[in-house]
Regions:
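Active-site-proximal loop->helix
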Residues: 142-150
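N-terminal "arm"/small-domain region of PLP-dependent enzymes with the aminotransferase-like
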Residues: 12-78
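Conserved N-terminal alpha-helix of the aminotransferase class I/II PLP-enzyme fold
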Residues: 66, 73-114
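Conserved PLP-anchoring active-site segment centered on the Schiff-base-forming lysine
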Residues: 122-141
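Short, small-residue-enriched loops and turns at beta-alpha junctions
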Residues: 57-58, 85-89, 141, 162-163, ...
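Active-site phosphate-binding strand-loop segment of PLP-dependent enzymes
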Residues: 155, 160-211
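Short, structured coil segments at secondary-structure junctions
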Residues: 129, 149-151, 210
Length: 211
């Protein structure tokens, strides 16, 4: 039997491996230098950073840093020692949710650990097995995975293609006439992986015609 490491070395030129050398240090494991924020250094050059969840530099604001330091001093850096669903749920989560709900003038609020989880849960909460999901073929992975979890039908249309989207909506409409369900049409305002702009104005127009 071939040694597992020999197999890895042998197949390192596969679909992903062949790009590893070119991607390393750029697309993969890019090394940013300087204070975390919207402006940092990459390979010796000043760059505008969009790959951190700190686009506007709010994490560097003096008040935010002060709150971080006070929380670490009071509860320690390791608190709350567990995911929220298990043993990590605290009164701080609940207080923050109440403050968010009050700020937004809503009945309640719920915090997710990350956006991916929020999107999956939203799609699941909106749909039942009689409904149809229609989504862009290059939608973000969280949208695609949310659609895949759907127990009913799901259909894709070609990326940012108005005609393909309309034809798919026509198919979905015929199906919903049989099931009595509705249609969830998914696109993006800005596609995060490419920067392409979604045709939101046309999407709204189509959705008014295909309910």
């Amino acid at each position: 039997m071939t040694d597992i490491f020999e197999r890895i070395e042998k197949h390192s030129g596969g679909p992903l491996g062949q790009y590893a050398a070119k991607a390393f240090g750029y697309y993969m494991f890019p090394k940013l230098e300087g204070e975390l924020g919207p402006h940092m250094k990459f390979q010796g050059k000043d760059v505008l950073v969009w790959s951190l969840n700190n686009y506007l530099g709010l994490a560097n604001h003096p008040e935010v840093r002060k709150a971080d330091a006070e929380a670490a001093a009071k509860w320690g850096l390791a608190y709350p020692m567990g995911s929220r669903m298990m043993t990590g749920h605290t009164d701080l989560h609940e207080r923050f949710e109440r403050e968010l709900a009050d700020f937004e003038r809503k009945e309640d609020a719920f915090l997710f650990n990350f956006g991916y989880q929020g999107i999956l849960s939203t799609i699941d909460a909106l749909m039942d097995r009689h409904d149809v999901i229609v989504y862009d073929s290059e939608a973000h992975a969280c949208l695609i995975d949310g659609a895949r979890m759907h127990m009913g039908k799901r259909m894709t249309y070609r990326h940012n293609d108005y005609e393909s989207c309309e034809k798919t909506l026509q198919r979905a409409t015929r199906l919903c006439e049989e099931t009595g369900g509705g249609i969830l049409l998914i696109t993006e305002g800005v596609y995060g992986m490419t920067g392409a702009l979604g045709f939101l104005d046309k999407i709204v127009e189509l959705k008014k015609r295909y309910k």
